[in-house]
């Protein structure tokens, strides 16, 4: 009987699992709606008083999105003011709802990935995950890897969808231009 050879294991394909990059930590949406006057406008003095009295330490180590769920007049500086109070405590702060927070967190972590370790490699980005990896993370990852990889695939090493193959270097035909 002949020995069974695992061709997938010996293929040299590197599996990259975005789920392994999933940053652990609580996600929190800071909603400005309760701070609005009659749910239509924000008063600067009221917001500043709130910011002065609020316990910002409760956001320590958390991923925070500053958002307003009401259709109201909220100036840009209000989001910035809250961010200046949250940022010293939070692991990450951005503007948006829960979905936008997740996309922003993944974008940050994908951009921190050391893509050089994938130079000239055959990479398959794992497709199945138990955690909510946002679609933009896959797109961002593709953009990061494309300049360095030999090939990029999606799925599992035993069943991949080819996405990209680096062009082969052109050979010098031996003749020189005159």
Question: What residue ranges belong to the model's regions?
Answer:
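A domain-level signal for the structural core that forms small-molecule/cofactor-binding pockets
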Residues: 47-52, 127, 136-137, 144-145
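Extended, charge-rich low-complexity interaction segments
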Residues: 115-140, 177-178
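Short, non-transmembrane amphipathic alpha-helical segments
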Residues: 81-87, 137-146
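Short active-site-adjacent structural elements
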Residues: 74-75, 103, 132-136, 161-165
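N-terminal, charge-rich interaction modules
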Residues: 1-74, 79, 83, 90, ...
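Short glycine-rich or small-residue beta-strand-to-loop segments that form or flank ligand, phosphate
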Residues: 63-69, 94-96, 122-128
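Long, charge-dense
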Residues: 78-117, 155-160
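A generic local secondary-structure boundary/capping motif
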Residues: 4-5, 54, 112-115, 142-143
């Amino acid at each position: 009987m002949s020995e069974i050879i695992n061709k997938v294991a010996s293929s040299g394909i590197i599996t990259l699992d975005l789920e392994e990059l999933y940053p652990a930590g609580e996600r929190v949406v800071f909603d400005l709606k309760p701070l609005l006057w009659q749910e239509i406008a924000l008063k600067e003095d009221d917001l500043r008083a709130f910011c002065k009295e609020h316990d910002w330490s409760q956001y320590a180590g958390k991923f925070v999105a500053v958002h307003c769920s009401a259709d109201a007049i909220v100036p840009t500086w209000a989001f910035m003011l809250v961010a200046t109070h949250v940022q010293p405590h939070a692991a990450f702060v951005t503007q948006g709802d829960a979905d936008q927070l997740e996309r922003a967190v993944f974008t940050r972590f994908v951009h921190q990935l050391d893509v050089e370790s994938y130079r000239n490699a055959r990479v398959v980005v794992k497709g199945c995950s138990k955690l909510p990896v946002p679609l933009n993370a896959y797109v961002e990852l593709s953009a990061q890897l494309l300049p360095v990889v030999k090939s990029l695939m999606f799925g599992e090493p035993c069943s991949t969808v080819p996405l990209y193959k680096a062009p082969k270097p052109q050979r010098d035909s031996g003749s020189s231009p005159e």
